[in-house]
Every structure is written in C-alpha cells, then in structure tokens.
C-alpha cells in the first residue's frame, strides 16, 4: 500500500500524471483496503453470478426431491425423471453461460490515455487492443500471394516458353 501512496504523491515524468485521469481511483483504493483489512463480502457482480448458480442448483435439487417423494416405488421411472431434470438443469446453465459469453464478447474496455486524459472504448475487434487478429489476416494474405506467385512461376515453365527455345 505504501508504494501506491508514494506513486500517487510523486509527480510523473514530464509533469504528466496518469492518476489525475482516473476518477475511480479512490473507489479502487477503498476496495483494496477492504480486501487487505479482510472486510467480508465479494464484489456485487461476482455475488450475483454465484446467486444465479445457487438458485439453479436449488431448483434442480428441489425437483429431484419432489420426484423421489412421488416416484419412490418405481425406480426406473424415478431414474428417467431425474435424468430429465438433469438435462433441463444442464440446458439452463448452458443458456446462462452462453448469455454471459455473449455479454463478454460484446463488452468494451475503457482505456484512458495518460498524455491527454482522453478516454477510448476498445473492443477485442479493435486492432489497437487485439493485434493478433491482424496478424492472422496478414498471414493469410502472404500465404495467398506466395501460392499465386508459385502458380504463375509453374505456369510459365509449363506453358512452352522453355520449349520455344529448344
């Protein structure tokens, strides 16, 4: 914590300090201090995701319990009923998981430039943020160009230019 406070108090190189562009700094420091002082409670978003999982699990076990109560005597029907509830539970979890993945894919990241405090919202499709996508495109273009050049070179040697000299 002491190094963070020293960084905050010392001026940055060339008189520009990135921390002046960071309005959420006090909230983040407060959260870090809560973690250091072992104050209970996870972040709200994590607890909401956990609540979703616990709620779906509770529904599943309640349905299984009801099936056991009603179909206790017929074990084959009971196993089929439990298997059906298991499949429904899995489908609901997969649906929630797909929704979270889609939300994450479409999300943007807020990036602040220290030089002028301008805020940029970047996504993974942005070449500034994920340059690996552009490399794949350039690799594809280089491969295609090489294949075309080899095809042209091969075509020249087989078309008869070499035969005319003989």
UniProtKB/Swiss-Prot annotation:
Question: Membrane spanning segments where?
Answer: 138-154
User: Which residues are the signal sequence here?
Assistant: 1-15
Cysteine pairings via disulfide bonds: none
Q: Which keywords does this Swiss-Prot/TrEMBL entry list?
A: Membrane, Signal, Transmembrane, Transmembrane helix
* GO CC, one annotated term: membrane
Its membrane topology is listed as: Single-pass type I membrane protein
Localization in the cell: Membrane
Protein name per UniProt: Testis-expressed protein 51
Q: Which organism is it from?
A: Homo sapiens
């Amino acid at each position: 914590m002491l190094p963070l406070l020293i960084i905050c108090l010392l001026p940055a190189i060339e008189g520009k300090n990135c921390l002046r562009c960071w309005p959420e700094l006090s909230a983040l420091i407060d959260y870090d201090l809560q973690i250091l002082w072992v104050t209970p409670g996870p972040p709200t978003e994590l607890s909401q995701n956990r609540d979703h999982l616990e709620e779906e699990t509770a529904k599943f076990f309640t349905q299984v319990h009801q099936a056991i109560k009603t179909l206790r005597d017929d074990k084959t029907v009971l196993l089929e009923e439990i298997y059906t509830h298991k499949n429904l539970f899995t489908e609901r979890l997969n649906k929630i998981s797909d929704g979270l993945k889609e939300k994450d894919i479409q999300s943007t990241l807020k990036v602040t430039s220290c030089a002028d405090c301008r805020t940029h919202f970047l996504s993974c499709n942005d070449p500034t943020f994920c340059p690996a996508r552009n490399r794949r495109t350039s690799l594809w273009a280089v491969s295609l160009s090489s294949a075309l050049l080899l095809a042209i070179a091969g075509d020249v040697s087989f078309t008869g230019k070499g035969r005319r000299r003989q």
